[in-house]
Design a protein with these regions (language model features):
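Short, solvent-exposed coil/turn linker segments
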Residues: 83, 103-106, 120, 130, ...
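Intrinsically disordered, low-complexity N-terminal segments that are enriched in acidic
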Residues: 2-192
């Protein structure tokens, strides 16, 4: 097929269009009523756009809602009378839509690059299942249908037909569509390798590193989970870091903040401090930032754990994010009192996005495909053109089929229920997060101190006897077993009492060190006060990038030692400090 030119694809499109136009017609009276309702709706929108006072705006909004309801009512008898699956037009509708959206020039250019590319295009245009999946799941970025087919074929070629096959097939489709048009890593010109991105999420899922719901997302949802601009190495770091440094964030009952709550605790609201080029998400966590960087980090953390994310803007200086939760999509970092109706992302409004989210969640994929996607295909067949990068989000009397698809989507969206967003099913893999939650035992007693044969004493950091409020100091179980302590800010302090059965070797001083994890370049020293010393010791805390690391040992006096109190100095740059263990080693 590599010798086929633009004319071939134009002729093929004409032929497929002809087939489509032999399909269902519209009752003239119903058609006129719907067009009239669409026109009235447009007039109401235009009135709102030019309204000046708040009163005029509110009146125009009410008129728009009333007009839209009339559109819905006039569309219902038309929609009830149409079943595009019965008319034997499915193949022609799919081909037409793909040829229109991919463009004759685009297909010809790709197909003529090599014999393989020609074969890929031929396979795509003759494979109903793949065409359906492409269109059902939003089409490829940049309308690069040929490249999406190439990527999908390459990824599918290496798939094993094991218990992960169904999920991996969806991930492969999501990656192929999302990275059909090349994307680059954060603050670099390095192109993201689609196959490596697929491999990253496939392996992370297989190892149970992702959110428990990841197994059950749709391909359309996967696209918003795997499309991070972070490198695969940074995504892996994000999961490892949070599981070590702040494991409690992976189990928050308020799913809106699960994984991304670390923005509130650790991404300081301040001018960002980038310490190297290119910038990285590790630098962002350490150096802080305002609206933009904080939203970036929240999206990054959610996607690292496989959670679908949609970014948004409310005005040039306000950038936020929305994310999937089992109760529906929710917003983070938005302006107070605002909602999806006040935001947008690129050319898409939040209202438009949420309508599609709700419609897809309310019904099965097959119903959404048959009732919405095929209507959009018919609109392409009827030459109801879309402007470049246009998001068709309002009825248009001159684009009847596209308007019917929009109304149908609204009707489906209105059916959404609270439980429509639950993502559960038969276990393919037990996630580490599920295991962690199952093992949480808030009634478990503190772990005992341990004295080794060489005289070394190990004190579990969570086995303190006294601390101040939980908002400053908290303890929780670790992913790798045992417990850990988290000093949230510079106001926290903890005290340890040496049990009577723990004795020190007489006449010998000891070296004290701690196993800690930190995520900030600048650290406040840890202060140690003991009952047997007149002045406090200072322990330098390293920047560990979220990994467990031992501090440099300091020498302390242990004669008559019975209590140790650890604290830090309150400061604007004093953030979290995770402590796993305190070690006292004889010199």
């Amino acid at each position: 097929m590599s010798n086929f030119d633009t004319s071939f694809f134009k002729d093929l499109l004409k032929e497929e269009r002809r087939e489509c136009l032999e399909g269902p017609g519209l009752d003239l009276g119903l058609h006129e009523a719907f067009v009239e309702a669409c026109q009235a709706s447009q007039y109401a929108k235009e009135a709102k756009d030019i309204a000046e006072s708040e009163e005029e705006v509110e009146m125009a909004k009410a008129s728009m809602e009333e007009a839209l309801e009339k559109c819905v009512e006039s569309a219902k008898p038309i929609l009830d009378s149409i079943d595009l699956m019965e008319s034997d037009l499915e193949m022609s509708l799919l081909r037409t839509a793909i040829l229109v959206r991919g463009g004759s020039k685009g297909f010809a250019k790709f197909a003529n690059q090599s014999d393989l590319h020609g074969q890929l295009v031929e396979t795509l245009l003759n494979n109903k299942k793949i065409m359906k999946e492409f269109l059902l799941n939003g089409g490829p970025t940049g309308k690069k249908y040929g490249n999406a087919m190439k990527l999908y074929t390459q990824m599918m070629a290496g798939l094993e037909k094991d218990r992960f096959y169904k999920v991996n097939k969806k991930i492969a489709m999501a990656v192929a569509l999302e990275f059909a048009s090349p994307q680059t890593e954060f603050d670099t010109a390095v192109e993201i390798d689609a196959e490596k991105r697929f491999s990253h999420y496939e392996k992370a899922h297989r190892k149970g590193e992702l959110d428990p719901a990841f197994t059950y997302f749709s391909t359309w949802e996967y696209r918003m989970a795997i499309n991070s601009d972070a490198s695969n190495e940074q995504l892996q770091w994000a999961r490892n870091m949070q599981m070590v440094y702040a494991p409690h964030i992976t189990t928050l009952y308020d799913e809106r903040w699960r994984y991304n709550y670390q923005v509130s605790t650790d991404v300081g609201y301040r001018a960002p401090n980038w310490t190297a080029s290119p910038r990285t998400y590790q630098q962002l966590l350490s150096g802080g930032g305002r609206e933009g960087p904080r939203a970036w980090f929240g999206r990054f953390m959610c996607r690292a754990f496989g959670i679908p994310v949609w970014g948004f803007k409310q005005h040039p200086k306000n950038v936020g994010m929305s994310r999937w939760t089992p109760k529906g999509w929710e917003m983070n970092f938005q302006k107070p009192g605002s909602d999806f109706g006040t935001c947008h992302w690129d050319d898409r409004s939040g209202t438009h996005f949420m309508e599609e989210v709700n419609a897809r969640a309310a019904v099965s994929e097959s119903e959404f495909y048959e009732k919405v996607i095929l209507l959009e295909c018919l609109a392409d067949a009827c030459k109801e053109k879309m402007k470049k990068d246009e998001e068709f989000d309002f009825v248009d009397p001159e684009r009847v089929w596209r308007s019917l698809a929009l109304v149908q989507r609204k009707i489906l969206a209105d059916k959404v229920q609270t439980d429509s967003f639950q993502r559960t099913g038969p276990n393919v893999v037990i996630s580490k997060i599920d295991k962690y939650i199952q093992n949480i035992n808030e009634q478990a007693p503190p772990l005992p101190y341990d004295k080794l044969d060489n005289g070394t004493i190990k004190i579990p950091a969570a086995s303190f006897t006294e601390s101040n409020e939980k908002k400053h100091v908290r303890s929780h179980q670790s992913f790798d077993g045992g417990n850990q302590l988290h000093m949230v800010d510079g106001k926290g302090h903890v005290t340890y009492e040496i049990p009577e059965d723990i004795s020190f070797q007489e006449g010998i001083d000891y070296m004290l060190s701690l196993i800690v994890a930190t995520v900030h370049l600048t650290q406040q020293n840890l202060q140690l006060e003991t009952n047997n010393a007149t002045s406090a010791y200072e322990i330098e805390i390293p920047y560990t990038l979220g990994e467990w690391q031992e501090t440099e040992p300091i020498e302390i006096e242990v004669g008559a030692l019975s209590t140790m109190k650890f604290s830090r100095t309150k400061a604007s740059d004093c953030f979290g400090l995770a402590i796993k263990e305190i070690i006292l080693t004889p010199c």
